[in-house]
């Protein structure tokens, strides 16, 4: 990769970060984020030279925070500044004048939680997990920390095996339960898969190869499965979108171990969702109407049936 190409990539990531930041609406907001970025990159804020890898890490983690977790300007500013605060190269008093009290509070939380993390190395301790998950008053502290760990997991293949194992232990005991607690189910599922990939690489590879080997037949089966429902929904004038996905490797392995069966004996390895476009007052009736159509086409399994219409999940 040439220097020019790298420069363009960094600029593109920075612009993408600004676009994905939902509450970035004014020129002043953009100025503050740019100020935080420039501060993070400056020699005065770093004990050693900033590398291209450092910049990509910062921007990629920022995109996780905005695009995948849904946080905004304040969290991005804190992400950009907290390493300099943690190293002592930048003081909270210096930050307060430019960025305000809320940024200082979150940065103080990040500094303290990093200290706890560095001084409590027994990550599979229940006391440590409770301490870390309940420490900060502002949940954005923990969400920023979570985003950094997700970045580490996504790039764990470059780590030595012992560091990979340590990251897997942390992920299993701390970050997966935390993501679940906050309803970040996509992040939770990805972390479970990545923890399995580096924690049990042979098992992960075996299931991955089997999924790939059955992909074409599975896609054909799913298309045939949803076709009669789609036709009936259209005939009834139901507005909807349909999405389907193969379940995660970690989820499949959990089923195999729970039921003590082989991969070939797991039949529900994909999930289909019909998302209705309904008005609030008609939503419940439309859901029951849709369920009736599906039940007419395919016999429900009472043991696997969950009534989220009458008793919705706590996260809605």
Show where each model-derived region lies:
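Nucleic-acid processing machinery
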Residues: 2-6, 10-25, 35-36, 42-49, ...
